[in-house]
Amino acid sequence: LRDLHVGVIFLLLFCVTNFGYSQNLVVNPSFENFINCPVKLGNLELDVEDWSMPTLGSTDYFNGCSEAMGTPKNFNGQQPADFGVGYVGLYMFAPNDYREYIEASLHSTLEKGERYTISFYVSLAERSDFAVKEFGIRFSEFPVQIETSKVLSSMHFSKLKGDTSNELEIKYSKFYSDEIEWIKLTQEFVANGTENYLIIGNFKNNKRTQKFQTKRKITKGSYY
C-alpha cells in the first residue's frame, strides 16, 4: 500500500483551547516528544509519546533525527516541519476503504457546555494522487482500539464503552491540495463534558468521500 501514494497527508501541531484561555489541551501537540527515533513505517504509537493508532491502519511518524523516516525529505516527497522537526503522515483515502487515523489524549476532560476551538495544520504529500475536501474529528471518553484497517464508522463507535457522540467535520471551500505550504484547519465546538481523547481521520467510505484527482496515475490514494 505504501507504493500507492493515494491520498497522503502530513499532520502538524494540534491545538484544543477553551474560549478565553490559551492553554493547549492536547498532550505533545507537535509530535516533538518521542520514545524512539523512527526507523520504519507504521510505528507511530511505539515512537511518539501520548499518540496512538485506534485501528490496524499503519500511521507513520517522521522526524529530522531519522534517515529512513526523516524530515524534510522522505519517501512521500519533501515537506519541512514548521514547528520543530516532527510530523505524522496518514492515508485519508485509499483503495478498498483502507484508512489511517491518529488518536491523542487531552490534558483534562472538556467541560460540559463550554466552547472550544480545535486547530491543526495539514499538507498534501507530493506523491499523492488525490486531495480530500474534509477532515473528521471524533472525541471519546475512553481510548479507542478497533480491529479494522478500514473506515471507522458510526457503527463501530456505537459499540464502544463511554460517550463518543461528539463529532466534527472540517470542510474546505476548495480541496486540501497544497503540497508546499501548511494549511491551518480550525473548528469551534461545544463540549459534552466527556471528551478525554480525540481521533483525526476520514470517517467516510470511498463512495462518500469528496476528492479531487491531483495527478493522472493508475494508483489512487490521498496521503497527508
Describe each region flagged by the PLM:
Residues 143-150:
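Short aromatic-acidic-glycine turn motif
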Residues 1-26:
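Bacterial Sec-dependent N-terminal signal peptides
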